[in-house]
Design a protein with these regions (language model features):
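Short glycine-enriched nucleophile-adjacent loop
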Residues: 1-9, 14
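Extracellular/periplasmic catalytic domains that process cell-envelope and extracellular macromolecules
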Residues: 7-8, 68-71, 103
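Glycine-rich, phosphate-binding/catalytic loops in enzymes
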Residues: 8, 31-33, 93-97
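Hydrophobic beta-strand segments of well-ordered beta-sheets in folded domains
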Residues: 13-15, 73-76
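Cell-envelope and extracellular/periplasmic
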Residues: 19, 24, 79-82, 115
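Mobile cap/lid helix-loop segments that gate and shape the active-site cleft of serine hydrolases
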Residues: 19, 24-67
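Surface-exposed acidic, glycine-flexible loop patches that form ligand/cofactor-binding
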Residues: 65-70, 136
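C-terminal catalytic histidine-bearing segment of alpha/beta-hydrolase fold enzymes
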Residues: 76-78, 85, 90-137
Length: 137
């Protein structure tokens, strides 16, 4: 949510912990195939747009992968590298897209080896980087 809003509004800085959902096509397709439990988000998208197979573009338009440029404010991303596979599936692609962004403000990545989904709140390294980011903005 914070990352998406950063393409719309300027602030004194944005912090995104384990940003997502990065790829709703992938996530909702797993749900449709019964590989993971259904979520309210994918169920609602399916009711509005049909399946990921019949209308993948609608799902992609809502995915964070579609919002990897145009950041109006500096942003700190914190991602635990032991997060769920569904989160990490698109993380390298998202990170690369943000790193090559030519119309973004400054982006900083903190990847926590061994960290899980809540790394911003559980990792001393992430907390330190969080505090440094806050103080600089």
């Amino acid at each position: 949510m914070a990352t998406r809003l950063n393409t719309m509004h300027q602030t004194n800085g944005v912090i995104a912990n384990a940003p997502g959902p990065l790829n709703l096509v992938y996530r909702c397709q797993l749900e449709e195939n019964g590989q993971i439990q259904s979520s309210a988000v994918c169920t609602k998208l399916k009711n509005v747009y049909g399946t990921t197979t019949s209308n993948p573009n609608a799902y992609f338009q809502k995915s964070l992968l579609n919002f990897s440029n145009g950041f109006k404010s500096d942003i700190l991303f914190v991602q635990g590298l032991n997060d769920a596979p569904i989160q990490l599936y698109s993380w390298p692609t998202f990170k690369k897209e943000v790193e090559i962004c030519t119309n973004c403000q400054n982006s900083q990545f903190v990847e926590i080896v061994g960290g899980e989904h809540g790394s911003l709140f559980e990792s001393s390294t992430a907390k330190t980087e969080f505090n440094k980011f806050i103080k600089s903005h």
